[in-house]
Design a protein with these regions (language model features):
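Conserved acidic donor-binding segment of nucleotide-sugar-dependent glycosyltransferases
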Residues: 51, 149-163, 171-178
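Donor nucleotide-sugar binding/catalytic pocket of nucleotide-sugar-dependent glycosyltransferases
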Residues: 1-7, 11-36, 42-43, 54
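Acidic donor-binding loop of glycosyltransferase active sites
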Residues: 106-120, 135-136
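Conserved acidic donor-binding loop of glycosyltransferase catalytic domains
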Residues: 114-115, 139-141, 150-151, 158-159
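Short hydrophobic faces within alpha-helices
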Residues: 60, 129-131
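A short, well-ordered alpha-helix in the C-terminal region of glycosyltransferases
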Residues: 165, 172, 179-194, 200-206, ...
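Conserved catalytic-core segment of nucleotide-activated headgroup transferases in glycan assembly
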Residues: 27, 38-87, 93-99
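Short acidic alpha-helix that forms the nucleotide-activated donor recognition element
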Residues: 98-108, 132, 146, 150
Length: 214
């Protein structure tokens, strides 16, 4: 994004100010109120959150096809629209409230974020929420995500559109509780102190003051 602003929009380096996004980590930790979705009966499932234009649902469909022994739960704001994209018995698409999302994060085995190319680091909210719930994450790398994740330390990255890499890393996570726990704990420690709403708003206020000259 920095290169885009400098090269495309002819901004000076000194004109670019930067902050990291943050969430309320306590909203998804072990003490947060969770509610099991009505009729939900899945166990040992892989959770995917979001079905916007930057989610690679085609990749996720292939991954589900390649892993018929695993259950995938996809949370969508418009589940009926996206159900036609998935016809497999091991894929469940639901809409979930905040408290139901807390339940799903805590109950899932780990989280996957299949991404298409984008510049605004799509998926970071899900990445942070999973870290707050202490769940391991597998996602496709896009520019900017290196600020929020470190491969094989706080998460696992797969290249964009790389089905083989995504599938291989997914099965690594599935097979190794030790790996899942290590990534989840490292992600929590790395993200919760600097990527929270308090720190984000604090920096945003300072940036706003600099921009406005006050």
């Amino acid at each position: 994004e920095k290169d885009e602003f400098i090269n495309k929009y002819q901004c000076e380096q000194s004109q670019l100010l930067y902050t990291r996004y943050g969430i309320n980590f306590s909203a998804y930790d072990y003490n947060a109120l969770s509610v099991k979705p009505i009729g939900f009966d899945k166990e040992d499932f892989i959770l995917s959150v979001g079905t916007d234009q930057h989610r690679d649902l085609e990749l996720l469909d292939v991954i589900a096809k390649n892993n018929p022994d695993k259950q995938f739960v996809i949370c969508s704001g418009n589940p009926e629209h996206h159900k036609r994209n998935f016809s497999r018995d091991n894929v469940t698409i639901i809409r979930a409230s905040y408290n139901e999302m807390v339940y799903l994060y805590h109950a899932c085995k780990f989280v996957v974020i299949p991404l298409k190319f984008n510049f605004h680091a799509s998926g970071i909210t899900t990445l942070l929420e999973a870290a707050a719930a202490r769940k391991a994450v597998l996602l496709n790398y896009t520019p900017g995500l290196e600020d929020y994740g470190q491969h094989d330390n706080t998460c696992l990255f797969a290249s964009l559109g790389d089905i083989e890499s995504f599938d291989r890393n997914l099965n690594k996570l599935w097979d190794s509780e030790k790996l899942r726990n290590r990534l989840a704990e490292n992600a929590y420690k790395y993200l919760h102190s600097d990527f929270n709403t308090y720190k984000y708003s604090q920096i945003y206020i300072e940036l706003s003051k600099n921009i406005l000259g006050i």
